[in-house]
Amino acid sequence: MGHGVLDSHRRPKEETLRTMTTELTGVIAEHIAAVNAFDTDAIVATFAADAYVNDNRREIHGVDAIRRWVEQEMVGDRVTLEVREVLDHHGDIIVRARYDGTFDKTNLPDELVMSNYFSIREGKIISLAVIRNQHSPY
């Protein structure tokens, strides 16, 4: 298995993760730029009306709730994102980014890198999951 030979039920890695880059396009590029500009209206405009966000195991549903989350925790805490890696996984986009800001950093690593799992439909974010993953030994 370590030599690239996979059983018939698994796809080779290059088919599963089609693109690995640090370049952003479309609504995700707009979203990250708006976050880094602390622009509440522009951030909210990247989401569909019925979008779903899971931020560190907290569920936020609908554009009104997302606006409150953005105002308080993104813009309010001056969060910035430095993109480290972008992966296209069957049309969903995974963005690994370094997070910084004025939020409480107690018990967090000096360099906080989190994974952002985006699903996009019709040019809008329909779901976003923000997760602080742990390194996998696999």
Named regions from a protein language model:
Residues 2-46, 137:
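Short, low-complexity N-terminal intrinsically disordered segments enriched in polar/charged residues
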Residues 50-61, 73-76:
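A short gly/proline-enriched turn/hairpin at secondary-structure junctions
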Residues 12-23, 67-138:
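A beta-strand edge to alpha-helix "cap/lid" segment located at domain peripheries
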Residues 36, 60, 99:
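Short glycine/serine/threonine-biased micro-segments
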Residues 1, 5-7, 29, 53, ...:
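Intrinsically disordered, low-complexity peptide-like regions
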